[in-house]
Amino acid sequence: MRAIEIAVRDVGGFAARDVGAALMRKAFDVDNGPLTDMTAERGERQALSDLFAGTMGTYKNAQSHRKVGLDDPDEAAEILMLASHLLRIVYARRSRTAAP
């Protein structure tokens, strides 16, 4: 999940001090987030912002602040798939946010 945070910072042009769920809310702000797809319906934009922020709060934040046991290999694989999909979304935004 740290890779997602780093990618969002990089692609969105955020500072190192921008972290976690708050960073995701800024990056995917429904009205002016640099990684927000403004062609999507408002509810979908909000849902994507919630997905990114929720992922940070649920997975990255927990791992950052305490030892979280992850003993189930299926669950670990599912979390990796989620992270991979979120990275795909971020990197798809890279060309839209690049300066001409």
Residue positions per predicted region:
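Amphipathic alpha-helical interface elements
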Residues: 1-55, 68-74, 92-100
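Histidine-centered active-site/metal-ligand motif
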Residues: 64-65
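Structured adenosyl-cofactor binding patch, chiefly the S-adenosyl-L-methionine
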Residues: 80-93
